[in-house]
Swiss-Prot record:
GO terms for cellular component: chloroplast; DNA-directed RNA polymerase complex; mitochondrion. DNA-dependent RNA polymerase catalyzes the transcription of DNA into RNA using the four ribonucleoside triphosphates as substrates. Keywords: Chloroplast, DNA-directed RNA polymerase, Nucleotidyltransferase, Plastid, Transcription, Transferase. It comes from Chlorella vulgaris (Green alga). It is an enzyme of class 2 (transferase). CDD domains: RNA_pol_B_RPB2 (cd00653). The gene is rpoB. Belongs to the RNA polymerase beta chain family. GO terms for biological process: DNA-templated transcription. It comes from the Eukaryota. This is DNA-directed RNA polymerase subunit beta. One of its GO terms (molecular function) is DNA-directed RNA polymerase activity. HAMAP family: RNApol_bact_RpoB.
Length: 1301
């Protein structure tokens, strides 16, 4: 079905629109040009990852190697100086695909030149040092480590610097916090008695700020003279000996003081004595000596190497408290401490405003560049410590070899350790770090969103226990930078966020998020100028107008008071005072949220669910783009590189399922350069299009022939005769492609160039009407006009001059690649042979795209009505058509590995001669039918649970008694199986899995000893790829884009489904009660507009928050399109004025109409990754917890199902006493009872039960509360069996506490 792209509102580029006579803001004339909504291009969605990694390569590596390594003893020394300007990268040993298959790192070896120098030697030796294996970011923006795709999250942390916290309303305590880049936090607080305290983690308890200021070298008189309101500090003198607490007196006695310290030395002794008093590990009886106290102070409390503010922290000190220290001085100084004290005193007298801790102005964004730099420094530090330990064991004399410096020989022997420590540190970050995560590859949107995720958790951030409601909340500075909608549900709500579509990380200074704004000059919005990129700090000074204000034709704001944001608060102001205006709604939301049509009609909680569930949609076998979209569907596919695009201009010569070949001109530009001035001048003069954009034109200018072109022909006449075919003007809008500025026919130019260079006997062209084909998916929108399809005769590669005119580019397509979530990714070509493509044009679709658009669901006919209770509580009733026609069928891939191990009795063997037990031989021989002569399953085989995939046997102890009986030995000899004792350890299909064997990969062994002991060409490791085809079934989870989700409860034959007046049966029946309480009305508007699009053969691109163009704009639009569809299709039931948007639907079982009109239409429904095949689980018996002796939980561990309080109530309501008794005893923690139950089942006797361990536990707990519970046993006899059973009787009595004691 061919759909014509239709715009429903103003949009981002010049786009052709169909006539819509609804309300203000919608066009009324066909083919008109709409004004540009904002003149900026959306940044690449994955560049936030690429730029971060590029920053590490360009700047981070050089920064890490600035300082040399120095080692010295009394007689020898060694200096290792790095030259970061000469860093070299070696080509990766494996390609990205090979790294995934072999389980390796897709990385590059890093080398750096180093200079080895010694003070006692005049030689300066330069050599290359192997730094380590650095994982390289792929083109898609992720890493491959150990064969697994991983993505690095961005982290939002607090800026280093100084912060004034608000005074607590109850305790009236003010706090000033100093946050260094390196080192512990410093708190300066004031208590109720106006005493000023200094607190760090090293001191463990707070001390007087006066003492610490004295310790850093500030005299008494300077403190009181330089500080304003310094009288408060007089309350901070410590009490004299005997007037304070006992511990305070101990501190003074140990320091040798009787009162407050008077000198700097006494302050050191007091601080050291205070530390020993409250330290659990220090000797408290030793006196504090001056030298020891001084060393303690400068090594622990005031270590300049640990109190590093960094450039950002120093800048904050200069801006907030007026520090005069230069930016180059990044350490905390005593002047900083004194000015911080002044800031706290000003806060107490209300002369200073507190800082907003949760504002983005106080935070910065860390990417993979900082993380890789940190772990590089960690690896270098580990090597330095390792080398220093080696140095300590060197002899004090010269080396045995002669006069050579022993440090040099030690360096040569251990420099390989440098690369090991650095490589391990980098690998540890990706594999065990919380910020290097297993990439979500469920679909293209999931991958894009995962790479644009931001978290406040992780090392250097906050922990889940420290979170507050303020941290999880939405701050005004999030506007245009972080999406207020998309965040996880549950414990991480508000802690993990997503970047908005237009937000970009700043490149210089503090890594903050910037968002664009239009400049406003005297009330006129400057949309022709590039938007300003504004940081959160700069936004405080702006007066911003919202994006939904209606402008005049000259982009002038209305002359009335307008709603604005001033200092991040809502105000109203006149247009002449406004400085900026927001660029659009995409400025406020993330990528996933922007894909929800009619977002403004949904509750924010449901929009959150819709954003998250789109990431969980499984790619389907037949992907289909939505009828109602928002316009970003192409960008998601294009930016994440999940589609094949042409890298060169040319025409397609060969198309197959595995590759596409494109023939590109090499010297065409040079051969037609003599006509360049003629071509462009003609293009300016000629405005008429060769082909009508709405209908096929067969005018005489449309068809022409060029016959027998000779090299000596009149080229001018030839050119002018074909000028109308060379170029055509696009009448709808200007393309913004990378390789072309106008729509022309370059294939004709290429053919003419061939004619000019040599004779071609005959070449003819003709026009053909062609439906829209996707162009460049990296651009926001594409043309809706019909393109000219040029074909020619006798086009073969031998017709052209080799290596002069054409060059062939081959594009390999990905076939059946497994993702991290076990979904299947494949690329399929969409263009036929002999098709001309431009650079950037789409050649092939991915697993979750159709015609270059994100396609993660299906457009199906839905109806909102209750149906026999089968859609109660969000359950979903679906038609058998969805199963038969594989509408919601998806492909899933799993791989199963098996490797040969080296046992104490020899190597295991992969073979098809497997020793079998005689009791299982018949069944197992049938299960082994797919194995070949090597013991590997054949590719293309259909396998079911229990089938053999790889045959393997493990040797047993030859001296041990045989496990096989004599007749089993004879049986194996007859079948010519192994005579020695082997155990069957083959790889078999797990339970609940069935599918086709897609591939068998023979891989090298990962254990060196196995490879050394094995024979040549022996199979040591095998990976079997299994492809499953899963149809929709009862228990699968489905959802829409508006947070409407449910579980399939029944699959009904299509003849029983409700049907429309034209006889079309409904595909899905949803419960209408799920709409009002959830307040997601957007699904109703989507399904009705989809119904109109289905009958009109149109696709719609809606503009979010379209109420700016008029009241009830969305509803007016839907009704107008339904009315138009009813007129064009001559179906009045599509739009009935007395109940618009509702249809008389017939019951498929009776043929009668339902009592009330039903809302029905085409909605975009997703099939989520929560499939019932992965959830359903049965356990006959299994492992038990060692502590509670109850079944473990989890399907992966073959666990049981926990019965909670409400489940027990449900069974009690039905009077299922025996079922409950069984659940509480033998199926839980009745140790004796479950053993006896097995014996009774074997003996065909009734199952008896005992007392569970949980009952014994509660019995002991009650006895601990002085309840005397006594348990008795009662004998009962069955008529058939004589069986002793235990029946508990509980007499309850109270005892006195004295009796117990």
């Amino acid at each position: 079905m061919s759909y014509k792209k239709t715009l429903i509102s103003k949009n981002f580029f010049f786009i052709k629109a169909l006539n819509c006579s609804v309300s203000a803001g919608y066009v009324e004339k066909t083919g008109c040009k709409l004004p540009v909504q904002f003149s900026m291009e959306i940044p690449n969605l994955i560049d936030v990852q690429r730029q971060s990694f590029y920053s590490f390569i360009e700047y981070g590596l050089k920064e890490a190697f600035q300082k040399p390594l120095r080692f010295s003893t009394t007689k020898h020394d060694l200096e290792i100086r790095f030259f970061p300007e000469g860093i070299q990268f070696r080509k990766p040993d494996f390609t990205q695909k090979q790294a995934v298959v072999l389980g390796k790192i897709y990385g590059s070896a890093v080398y750096i030149p180093v200079g080895i120098h010694s003070k006692k030697s005049s030689t300066f030796r330069i050599e290359w040092l192997f730094v380590g294996i650095l994982p390289i970011m792929t083109r898609q923006g992720h890493f491959v480590v150990n064969g697994v795709s991983r993505v690095v999250l961005h982290q939002m942390v607090r800026n280093p610097g100084i912060y004034t916290l608000p005074i607590h309303p109850r305790t009236k305590i003010g706090t000033l916090r100093i946050v260094p880049e390196k080192g512990g936090w410093i708190h300066i607080t004031v208590d109720k008695k106006h005493r000023v305290w200094f607190l760090t983690r090293s001191l463990r308890r707070k001390v007087s700020l006066l003492i610490f200021l004295q310790a850093v070298g500030i005299p008494f008189h300077d403190i009181f003279l330089r500080l304003e309101h310094s009288k408060i500090l007089q309350n901070s003198f410590v009490a004299e000996l005997g007037e304070g607490s006992a511990r305070h007196d101990d501190v003074l006695e140990r320091a040798g003081l009787y009162a407050h310290p008077a000198t700097q030395e006494e302050a050191w002794q007091y601080l050291y004595s205070h530390f020993k008093e409250y330290s659990p590990y220090a000797h408290k009886n030793l006196a504090a000596k001056e030298q020891t106290a001084r060393e303690f102070f400068y090594s622990t409390l005031w270590n300049k190497d640990k109190l590093i503010l960094g450039h950002i922290g120093r800048q904050q000190f200069r801006e907030k408290i007026g520090s005069i220290e230069p930016l180059e001085n990044t350490s905390l100084t005593r002047e900083d401490l004194l000015e911080a004290t002044q800031a706290l005193l000003s806060l107490m007298h209300k002369k200073r405003v507190v800082d907003e801790i949760d504002s983005l102005t106080q935070k910065r964004i860390r990417g993979c560049d900082e993380f890789l730099l940190e772990h590089l420094a960690t690896g270098m530090k580990e090597f330095e410590l390792f080398f220093r330990r080696k140095v300590t064991f060197l002899p004090a004399t010269k080396s045995i070899t002669g006069a050579e410096n022993p440090f040099r020989s030690l360096w040569r022997q251990n420099k390989a350790v440098f690369s090991k420590t650095v490589s391990k540190s980098w690998k540890r970050f990706f594999t065990s770090g919380t910020l290097g995560q297993f990439m979500d590859q469920t679909n293209s949107l999931a991958e894009t969103t995962h790479k644009r995720r931001l978290t406040v958790l992780g090392p250097g951030g906050i922990s889940g226990k420290q979170t507050t409601i303020q941290i999880r909340g939405i701050h005004p500075t999030y506007y245009g930078r972080l999406c207020p909608i998309e965040t996880p549900e549950g414990k991480n709500a508000g802690l993990v966020n997503s970047f908005t579509v237009l937000s970009v990380l700043s490149k210089y200074g503090a890594r903050t998020l910037t968002t664009p704004f239009y400049q406003v000059y005297k009330g006129q919005v400057q949309k022709t100028l590039p938007p300003l990129r504004v940081s959160p700090r700069q936004e405080y000074k702006l007066i911003e107008a919202p994006a939904d204000i209606q402008l005049t034709a000259w982009n002038v704001l209305p002359k009335t008071h307008l709603p604005v944001r001033k200092e991040l608060n809502f105000h109203s102001d006149v247009a002449t005072r406004i400085t900026t205006q927001s660029v659009g709604i995409l400025q406020n939301i993330s990528v996933a949220t922007s894909l929800i049509p009619f977002l403004e009609h949904n509750d924010a909680n449901r929009a959150l669910m819709g954003s998250n569930m789109q990431r969980q949609a499984v790619p389907l076998l037949k992907p289909q783009a939505p009828l109602v979209g928002t316009g970003l569907e192409s960008r998601v596919i294009g930016d994440v590189n999940h589609s094949m695009q042409a890298s060169k201009t040319g025409f397609i010569t060969k198309v197959s399922s595995t590759k596409i070949q494109v023939l590109s001109p090499r010297k065409t530009k040079a051969q037609v350069s003599v006509f360049s001035h003629v071509l462009f001048s003609l293009n300016k003069k000629k405005k008429k299009s060769l082909l009508n954009s709405e209908k096929q034109s067969f005018s005489k200018n449309g068809i022409f022939f060029i016959k027998t072109l000779q090299q000596k022909s009149n080229l001018k006449n030839i050119f002018f005769s074909a000028q109308k075919a060379l170029y055509q003007e696009n009448s709808s809008f200007d393309l913004k492609f990378e390789a072309q500025n106008r729509l022309f026919i370059p294939k004709m130019t290429f053919s003419l160039a061939q004619n000019f260079s040599r004779k071609i006997p005959f070449l003819s062209f003709f026009l053909k009407k062609k439906k829209e084909r996707p162009r460049n998916p990296k651009k926001f929108f594409r043309s809706s006009d019909s393109f000219v399809n040029w074909k020619h005769k006798k086009l073969h590669s031998e017709d052209f001059r080799k290596n002069k005119v054409e060059i062939t580019t081959t594009y390999s397509l990905i076939q059946y690649q497994r993702t991290n979530q076990s979904t299947c990714f494949s690329e399929r070509p969409i263009l036929p042979e002999n098709e001309w493509v431009e650079k950037g044009d789409l050649l092939a679709d991915g697993a979750s795209s159709s015609q270059g658009k994100l396609s993660i669901g299906q457009n199906v006919l839905v109806a909102y009505l209750p149906w026999e209770g089968y859609n109660f509580e969000d359950a979903i009733l679906i038609s058998q058509r969805l199963v038969d026609q594989e509408i919601f069928t998806s492909l899933h891939m799993d791989h199963y590995d098996i490797a040969v191990q080296n046992t104490q009795y020899g190597l295991e063997r992969i073979t098809n001669l497997i020793p079998l037990k005689i009791s299982d031989s018949t069944r197992d021989i049938y299960k082994m039918g797919n194995l070949d002569s090597r013991g590997l399953v054949e590719i293309g085989s259909w396998v079911e649970p229990g089938d053999y995939l790889v045959g393997k046997m493990s040797p047993l102890d030859p001296k041990s008694p045989p496990l096989q009986s004599p007749h089993e030995k004879l049986y194996n000899v007859i079948l010519q199986r192994e005579k020695t004792s082997f155990r069957n350890t083959s790889l078999r299909v797990p339970k609940g899995v069935q599918g086709f064997v897609l591939g068998v990969q023979i891989l090298p062994s990962q254990e060196p000893d196995v490879a050394a002991l094995a024979e040549k060409d022996e199979i040591l490791r095998v990976r079997v790829l299994l492809l499953q085809r899963r149809k929709i079934q009862v228990g699968d989870k489905m959802a829409g884009r508006h947070g409407n989700k449910g579980i399939v409860s029944l699959i009904l034959p299509r003849q029983d489904m409700p049907y429309l007046p034209d006889g079309t049966p409904v595909d899905i029946v949803l419960n209408p009660l799920g709409v009002p309480s959830r307040m997601n009305v957007g699904q109703i508007l989507e399904c009705l507009l989809g119904l109109a699009g289905h009958f009109l053969h149109e696709r719609y691109t809606t503009y979010l928050f379209d109420e700016q163009y008029g009241a009830e704009a969305s509803r007016s639009l839907v009704y107008s399109k339904l009315y138009q569809a009813s007129l064009k299709t001559r179906n009045p039931w599509v739009f009935e004025p007395h109940h618009p948007g509702k249809i008389r639907v017939f019951d498929g079982r009776t043929g009668l109409t339902f009592d009330q009109p039903i809302t029905a239409g085409y909605a975009y429904i997703l099939k989520l990754v929560h499939l019932v095949d992965d959830k359903i689980h049965a356990r006959p018996t299994g492992p038990y917890s060692a502590i509670t002796q109850q079944p473990v939980k989890g399907r992966a561990r073959n666990g049981g199902q926990r019965l909670g309080e409400m489940e027990v109530w449900a069974l009690q309501a039905y009077g299922a006493a025996h079922t409950l008794h069984e659940f509480f005893t033998v199926k839980s923690d009745d140790l004796d009872g479950r053993q006896q139950a097995v014996l009774n089942i074997y003996a065909n006797k009734p199952v008896t039960t005992g007392n569970p361990e949980s009952f014994k536990l509660i019995l002991r707990e009650l006895q601990a509360l002085c309840f005397n519970f006594q348990v008795y046993e009662k004998y009962s006899y069955y008529s058939e069996y004589t069986q002793k059973t235990r029946v508990s009787i509980f007499p309850i009595s109270f005892i006195k506490l004295e009796d117990v004691l």
